[in-house]
Each structure stands twice: as structure tokens, then as C-alpha cells.
């Protein structure tokens, strides 16, 4: 994966591309703007703009958000809904559920590990929650 800055290619790792996708999903959770506007509003945060992987994954997640949220709901404690999950954790879970369910090119264990790392970086002590939900999801499949 690569982006361009001043005519030069910038190589991104899959982790960096995934982090861009997380940041787009998180940003999108605050507004009802079209995805294109969210991408445009956030592209300056990243050297070379937002990579194609992040844009593609976020677009697919937005298209399947209701289905993904319904899947997440199955693994919440009784009485909980996705609206109770913090915005950062929900963005992380949506990304990981999408990768696990729809992207055969990404091993489940990698999706879980990356999600836990994002949770450690962007949430206050919710990495165990994210890990538990994803573990239950993987065991159910």
C-alpha cells in the first residue's frame, strides 16, 4: 500500500492502513456526512492522504454497518446495545469484524491482535473488552 506526497510514493504497512481506516470510522461516527466528505476532511491528517485500503474498507463497512452491528450485538452482555459501546471501541470492533468476516486475506489472529493494539492506543482500558468480544466471535464461527 502506498500514498503519494509531493510526487513521491510513501509506503504504508497494513497496520498503518488499518489505523487510517479506524480513524476514518471514528471520525464518521460523529456526523452524517457522506463518506467522501469525511475522507476529504481527514486526508490532511496523513502524509500523502488516505490510502486506498482504508478508503475501500471503510466504504464497505459503511455499506454493511447494520449487519456488522447486529453481529457485534450477539456478543454483548444481556441488556447491552452497540450504542453503549464507546465510539473508539465500536470503530475498532466494526473494523475487526469486517476483516474477520469478509477479508480472507487477513488471518483472524492478525485482525484480533491489531484491534487490541488499536484499543490500547486509542481507548482507556478497553482492550480486554475488544479482545473478549472478538474472541467470542471467532469461537462462534
Where are these regions (language model features)?
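N-terminal interaction/assembly modules
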Residues: 1-141
